[in-house]
Amino acid sequence: MSDTTLNVSLASQGYPEPAELFANLGTAPLVEHAVRNGEGLLCVDGPLVVETGKHTGRSAKDKFIVRDAETENTVWWGKTNVAMSPEHFAALKADFIKALGEKDRLYVADLFGGSQPEHRVKVRVINELAWHNLFIRTLLVRPTTDELASFVPEYTIIDLPSFRADPARHGSRSETVIAVNFTEKLILIGGTAYAGEMKKSVFGILNYLLPVKGVMPMHCSANVGPDGKTAVFFGLSGTGKTTLSADASRTLIGDDEHGWSDTAVFNFEGGCYAKMIRLSAEAEPEIFATTKRFGTVLENVVIDPVTRTIDLDDNSLAENSRGSYPIDFIPNASEENLGPVPANLIFLTADAYGVLPPIARLTPDQAMYHFLSGYTARVAGTEIGVTEPEATFSTCFGAPFMPRHPSVYGNLLKERIAKGGVKCWLVNTGWSGGKATQEGIKRMPIKATRALLNAALDGSLNSATFTKDPNFGFEVPVEVPGVDTKLLDPRGAWADGEEYDKTAQELVRKFVDNFQQFADHVDQSVRDAAPVAA
């Protein structure tokens, strides 16, 4: 049985077809299937609420790329991009096909990765779970009926949470596996129900393909101001990419993954994937409103099985609870999913050391340095006695998703900054006045962050007086209307200036040590943009 006809059948791809094949279903039927299959519950306000089991985040250590003639010299092999042999992949593929043949029911979605037609990739996703199919249909770009009629997939993703990998037979690390084969244009995901693996797999495809075409792929959010100028926000998880780009006064291009071509910044996706934990209507009204919409999928959000009400503050299932929803659920979302090339780049960091200023102006060389560094810091689990902040460097603000050498992306970025005269800013959404682990130290007020951002984006900050930071070398504004002056001086915000100096130098050394891996791949001017160790 099939609800809709595929232009290219599964059989023609060499995959078995189940008794029930549901292709390119819409939101309502997929929600019905998910509920009927026992995959989730409908919330009182409309969203579908699901649990992902033991995997509530990405399984970064279980991801592999097949090492062959195509990838041998094009992939940056190491801790992030781990090799799988073609032989192991062949065994894995054979077992995936066998597992597909044992399914009574499958869901297929033909979708685009990328909103700019000349730079998008055609992706087919095959799922055993209806809610997974709904998720990826929400997150990627949905073809029109006419486009589906002639759709020929370039890449295929098969996602089977029930599959269990065998490390001895498949070369995996555990029963969970995400295996990417750029030669066969096939991605196999097994042993995890975390839906984000699918979206990040498509991101990885585009991050591999687009630099060859001179297009800069970015792990970022992006929006456009009333003046028609685009801002791009880079940042690791938890730094505020989604929150700060969902601004009612600006048009949202997207919240997570974009390309920068000669003519546009374009969203890779057609949906958003936002953190839900402790979400509030006051702090994030646009995102909060999506938790009351039919079509939203809430992952690992606690729901009362009787009243069907949800508790966004309850982290008993996961700290990384998520919500996926179509981008048009956000007011002022761009209808085309794209905008002009950027006027401003924002590097977001949540500095748990409390030494970075709330905003700093960067030169193009400093921008490339901080892009390649990809710094943020988190507070490690204090429940096990760890009381110091933990520095995290994820190159390009998205190391797990960048198959090529970071310098490929860094040089592309530097070229585009120079070509467009783009203004670059570092924004600290983390802590001020001390380390995050110290009692009474609070995060930067979001109102202050927004005020500083607005001043940067509307151009008024350019006329401010700046002072050079002695540790990091970038320029920090002395005064900004509507922002407490004490906040702008990170050293002055500390009760003990000497303790600040010591902590700042501690962070400087971490930057310097981390950047050694890139030193031979960048110009001297970028090396000179490094923070200064005393």
Curated annotation (Swiss-Prot):
Keywords: ATP-binding, Cytoplasm, Decarboxylase, Gluconeogenesis, Lyase, Manganese, Metal-binding, Nucleotide-binding. Its main location: cytoplasm. Substrate binds at R58, Y194, K200, R322. It comes from the Bacteria. Its cofactor is Mn(2+). It is found in: Cytoplasm. Mn(2+) binds at K200, H219, D256. Pathway: Carbohydrate biosynthesis; gluconeogenesis. NCBIfam families: pckA, PRK09344.1-2, PRK09344.1-3, PRK09344.1-4. Involved in the gluconeogenesis. Catalyzes the conversion of oxaloacetate (OAA) to phosphoenolpyruvate (PEP) through direct phosphoryl transfer between the nucleoside triphosphate and OAA. This is Phosphoenolpyruvate carboxykinase (ATP). The lineage of its organism: Bacteria, Pseudomonadati, Pseudomonadota, Alphaproteobacteria, Sphingomonadales. The gene is pckA.
